[in-house]
């Protein structure tokens, strides 16, 4: 998708505007009105750069859990995007327990799609003012309540192969997805460690609740049950009377057609809630598999229609900010950087995600399956400050916003003890930009950092491969050269002045959220947060120390002060300090 304004992902199939009366009050549903208002604001934030959209009619889709009477997502869309094909794409990307439950009527205009049980009555003024009371007055069948995130994630990797004829790829992709859906009953999911099996059950076994001990109190982004997918060659036919069941048919043609073989490894993820029966889990596993296949089909067809040919995809699972369920996408892997950026912009609009920061970079995907974790985990400790216990705040705490990796002396087989602390602080900062979706470029090595400084003529050629120190200025130069990032500076004449600038640091963590490199007294450290009492002036700094030379032992790192809250006296009163505050771009998606 080369244009973020493309109307639909598959086809137009647009619904005509209708005016719908309020639904009868016969059941009580739950909705998080603030989350709905935020989604509306996110979509409208895209229109600020497009004058043609400012007055365009807006409608939307309401997705939820019918059995629990919960609205999970209210996704707003401009009129041209209110299509059945987009509804199918959105649903195929959501958790397998979530489906279309309603439609929207905004200022008397609505686009009704089949499957909705009710229509939310909204006004532009209500949405812009975030008026919960007005919403509840107009929608008496709803309670405003934050829906809790719950359930374990069942995850498995399933491979499937499609053969696509030259000139008929779209037709063959759709047919292949339909065949996969029809054959999904053949899949059995096995966890040998715990003796768990998810499969089609006989009636007497269908109500067993054998995952309750795993799903009680679980949350889907960290409590994972991994399954191996196995395909049955036959269905259980013990109660059938026919002699012949499913018979495979092979049709051979000799027309010299060129075929493209498309192999996809899809990550199938579905939730297990406390109280689910084995039948619930089996149905959900089939639905999750079908959604992966359909999502793959839609992205592939879209690529063909856009003239990119048959594209390979990879599975990615996300927990976007403010969401209480997971988002599952098949993302193209061979598109250009610009094509992928335009596609991400498109997805941000469809899912009402922020327009000002990345959410759907591959580096931001959850590593739920062990194979995904193996490919993404370099055995670095992530966010060690979250493992600090028994700290008593002295005032108001503000910290780094988003994940980062702890880089320190002696990693990567490099003995940089005594000279590499600023390089390691730089690498920690760079990891933040990777893990928060601002870049896909790997963390630079010491040599690559040195080469960048030579390239901008800050250092001579002999600097590359040396053991010379770098400081705060060099760090800002390299961030600008390699990532085109701007940095703010705080310069102080003593450690006492570092404390005086604590309000600036707090504001930085609140607005920008990046780690801060501080250099002085021939040492470099990384500041991850501040704790400031505005009444007493007492201040503490959350410091990550790159001088650590040990193994990746989180207990040692947090208990021995390598990642810890430090008093103001930690900064020497006899030395000056310079701080580098990297600024994330405001238009990166």
Swiss-Prot record:
Q: What is the effect of changing residue 458 to A?
A: Strongly reduced ability to hydrolyze ufm-1 bound to a target protein
**Disulphide bonds in the chain:** none
Q: What is the effect of changing residue 421 to S?
A: Abolished ability to hydrolyze ufm-1 bound to a target protein. No significant effect on GPCR localization in AWA cilia or odorant chemotaxis
Using the UniProt annotation, give all residue ranges assigned to the region (Disordered).
1-22
Impact when changing residue 547 to A: Abolished ability to hydrolyze ufm-1 bound to a target protein. No significant effect on GPCR localization in AWA cilia or odorant chemotaxis
Annotated membrane topology is:
Peripheral membrane protein
**Any GO CC annotation of this UniProt entry:** endoplasmic reticulum membrane
Query: Which GO molecular function, any one, fits this protein according to its record?
Result: deUFMylase activity
Pfam families cross-referenced by the UniProt entry = Peptidase_C78, UfSP2_N, UfSP_MPN_N
Task: Work out whether the entry's keyword set contains Glycoprotein.
Answer: no
Give the record's keywords alphabetically. Chemotaxis, Cytoplasm, Endoplasmic reticulum, Hydrolase, Membrane, Protease, Thiol protease, Ubl conjugation pathway
Q: What tissues contain this protein?
A: Expressed in head and tail neurons. Expressed in the amphid head neurons ADL, ASI, ASH, ASJ, ASG, ADF, ASK, AWA, AWB, AWC, and in two tail neurons, the phasmid tail neurons PHA and PHB.
* Impact noted for substituting residue 421 to A: No significant effect on GPCR localization in AWA cilia
Q: What happens when the gene is disrupted?
A: Aberrant localization of odr-10, str-2, str-112 and str-113. Reduced response to odorants mediated by AWA and AWC olfactory neurons. Increased aggregation and response to O2 levels when knocked down with npr-1.
Q: Which domain of life is it from?
A: Eukaryota
Give the main location.
endoplasmic reticulum
Q: Where is the active site?
A: 421, 545, 547
The keyword Amino-acid biosynthesis appears for this protein: no
For this protein, the Enzyme Commission number is 3.4.22.-
Stated consequence of mutating residue 409 to H: Strongly reduced ability to hydrolyze ufm-1 bound to a target protein
- Which BP terms does GO give this entry? chemotaxis; positive regulation of chemotaxis; protein localization to non-motile cilium; proteolysis; response to ethanol
Q: How does it assemble?
A: Interacts with odr-4.
Q: What does this protein do?
A: Thiol protease which recognizes and hydrolyzes the peptide bond at the C-terminal Gly of ufm-1, a ubiquitin-like modifier protein bound to a number of target proteins. Required, with oct-4, for the localization of a subset of 7 transmembrane domain odorant receptors, including odr-10, to the cilia of olfactory neurons AWA and AWC. Operates in aggregation behavior, and responses to oxygen levels.
Protein family: Belongs to the peptidase C78 family.
Its protein name is Ufm1-specific protease
Give the source species.
Answer: Caenorhabditis elegans
Q: Its gene?
A: odr-8
